[in-house]
Amino acid sequence: MKLSVNDLNVFVNTPKDIAKLCEDLSRLGLEVESCIPCIAPKNVVVGKVLEKAPHKNAEKLSVCQVDVGKEVLPVVCGAKNVAPNQFAPVALKGAIIGSTTIAKTELRGVESHGMICSSIELGFPKINDGILELDESVGELVLGKELHEYAPFNTHVLEISLTPNRGDCLSVLGIAREISAFYHTPLKPIKALNFTPTSDLITLSADENIESHLAYYLICNHSLKTPLNIKLSLAHNNALSENDLNNFIEFSAHFSGVILNAYSLNKTPIDLIIKNDENNLESVYINHQKRSTIVIKHQDQKDLSECLLLEASYTDPVSLSLKLHALKDKTLQKDNALVYRSTRGSNPNLSDGLNFLSAHLKAAILESKQTEHSLKDCALTFQLEDITEILGLVIEAEKIQNILKNLGFKVSTKEPNSKPQILEVIVPNFRHDIKTIQDIAEEILRFVGIDNLVSKPLHCVSSKNSNPHYDTHRFFENLKHKALACGFKEVIHYVFYSKEKQQKLGFEVLEDPLELQNPITTELNTLRTSLVCGLLDASLRNKNLGFKSIALYEKGSVYNSKREEIQKLGFLVSGLQKKESYPHAKGKAWDFYSFAECVSRIIGDFSLEKLTTQTPINHPYQSAKIIQNNEIIGVIAKIHPKVIQELDLFESYYAEIDASKLKRPAMLLKPFSIYPSSVRDLTLIIDENTAFSKIKKALKDAQIPNLSEILPLDIFKESGNTIALSVRCVIHSLEKTLNDEEVNSAVQKALEILEKEFNARLKG
């Protein structure tokens, strides 16, 4: 949005401090992106061309006698449009035009005492080719008067960035309203034209479903020569055209904010119909011929007649935007600038636009018509405390009312004696953005100033909003990242597998009534009951591709014999744990405990117990149940050598874990001792069928003071059914350094419990 300060002065007296004006507009939310002075240079005066004669030594030059008030000067000029009796700006001796200082000079043998200037040479936008022709629209032309003494040639051009909801400020009148409200200066309204209809040529009819508001003036005896002040205003806004009628329409729309159009007519009866076209867009038909699509596309006016039908229109911006969005896939003829102005909200006071345009056309109004639609008022009711709560700032009731009244709101007190005080506000029809009490608060804040808000800390209590599904997802994502860090590669397989292969490996299968009715292929004829089968297939493919070190991880669904879905984790390692590299010249193969340790780094600490039942896939002596939190969560085993041989695999190990039984570890703080610990190693003679886990549990349940940890060290076969089990007892206190007597006491109590529970004794 571009406009000059001179344009604003049509509606309001602007302050002389332009920098302060720009700063205040930006505070109001109308951000001034640039402010460019447009001031004519000094020693450029109003002159009148008295005579024009051809240059004796140059065909394209002419010698003009120019009256500059005090004297008549000969000036050599090369412009084609220079002519006698023409007023034009003349740069006299000493004037600086661009980077050139004007001086008396000789051009092709003829003296020239100045320069007749174009608008571009004066630092203004291009108005026309050749010199700038002056007229009385800029003020009374006095020969010899400095050009910068005329307001249009001594102004500033502002470029204002508007938010999409402020369509009311897409006009000079809209910006002037804001200035008037902020500086408490009166707004100069557009004068209403008094006229008496002298014809009855227009018959206006509109369909019932028409939403647009329309008003018409039939005029004649109009003047269609664009005056200089209009040209300058449009040129500043990059909207000047060669069509005079379009210039008047654009100028009036730019100033008033009303969408305007004009139709060239003969002075005959006019059948004016408003109805929807083939795209369901409201259109104007004159004598059954479509002439325009309301607020979307206007026809260019070329052949002008004595009579013109002026049209002012308004369509609700929200309704229009929805219609255009519904037709986004269709190719529509539309004027983008017109649609931009319409969809952001034009001025619904149609008479303002028609009166402004008619006055500048200096036309006689023969007749006026308008549709019978009327805009509904938007009323908002609120308490003063509501504004205080929203802004966090106490503002006096009188100040709030004055701000709103200055902005054009109608404010009344509802139930004057009530406490708290209740206000009812009628929103002006040109403010399409005001819908709620929050919008009212924003208007008040704009004029109070956001800098005047008191900074306060935000008092809030944040409750933990836990999402169990997300927590579970993050838990398994973290497990996956740990597996990747340990060298495992994630794999994904179908949930379908071969029933025969699963049975051969010893895994359960679905009950016959629950089997797939229409399997994809014979190789995928059932639902998998274990992840291990797919991992074995993937291991074989990688072996065949030349990989010697294979570590795979998978999380997925498996099904039990009742076809109930279970989420499981699967791990499989095959071949080398470490590739051939110093110090392992032949590589390092996996072993059971290395694999178990690797899995524990991923899922957390666990213990192992011997499997009570064996399956064909498991090695009978290297397989175990995985125990975590006193619960069986899965199986870990070496693949049976027969299976390895049949499948042609490297030596392999697998672990399969029920994902539902894995628990997120609680973050618990535990104290640690700053005092040294004591270690006692014991070798016990004990029954070979006694599991170390039972020994550990018995000592833990006994809660022996200062005995913090017991670890297995070694095992030896003794005579008969006994073994020699070496264990290490770690003893320390959180409170002090223990002496030998206290350490020996803890060891003695441990031996007593072991002897009582397991018939264990120290090896002699």
Curated annotation (Swiss-Prot):
Catalytic activity: tRNA(Phe) + L-phenylalanine + ATP = L-phenylalanyl-tRNA(Phe) + AMP + diphosphate + H(+)
Gene: pheT
Domain FDX-ACB: 673-763
GO CC annotations on file: phenylalanine-tRNA ligase complex
UniProt cross-references to PROSITE patterns, sorted A to Z: B5 (PS51483), FDX_ACB (PS51447), TRBD (PS50886)
A single GO molecular function term of this UniProt record: tRNA binding
Keyword Cell membrane applies: no
Keyword Magnesium: yes
Localization in the cell: Cytoplasm
Sequence positions that bind Mg(2+): 433, 439, 442-443
EC number: 6.1.1.20
GO biological process: phenylalanyl-tRNA aminoacylation
Cofactor info, note text: Binds 2 magnesium ions per tetramer.
Essential cofactor(s): Mg(2+)
Subunit relationships: Tetramer of two alpha and two beta subunits.
Homology family: Belongs to the phenylalanyl-tRNA synthetase beta subunit family. Type 1 subfamily.
Start and end residues of each tRNA-binding domain: 38-148
Xref: InterPro entries: aa-tRNA-synth_II/BPL/LPL, DNA-bd_dom_put_sf, Fdx_antiC-bd, Fdx_antiC-bd_sf, NA-bd_OB-fold, Phe-tRNA-ligase_IIc_bsu, Phe-tRNA-ligase_IIc_bsu_bact, PheRS_beta_core
Protein name, as recorded: Phenylalanine--tRNA ligase beta subunit
Top-level lineage group: Bacteria
UniProt KW keywords: Aminoacyl-tRNA synthetase, ATP-binding, Cytoplasm, Ligase, Magnesium, Metal-binding, Nucleotide-binding, Protein biosynthesis, RNA-binding, tRNA-binding
PANTHER family: PHENYLALANINE--TRNA LIGASE BETA SUBUNIT, PHENYLALANYL-TRNA SYNTHETASE BETA CHAIN AND LEUCINE-RICH REPEAT-CONTAINING PROTEIN 47
CDD domains per UniProt: PheRS_beta_core (cd00769), tRNA_bind_bactPheRS (cd02796)
Major subcellular location class: cytoplasm
Domain B5 residue range list: 375-455
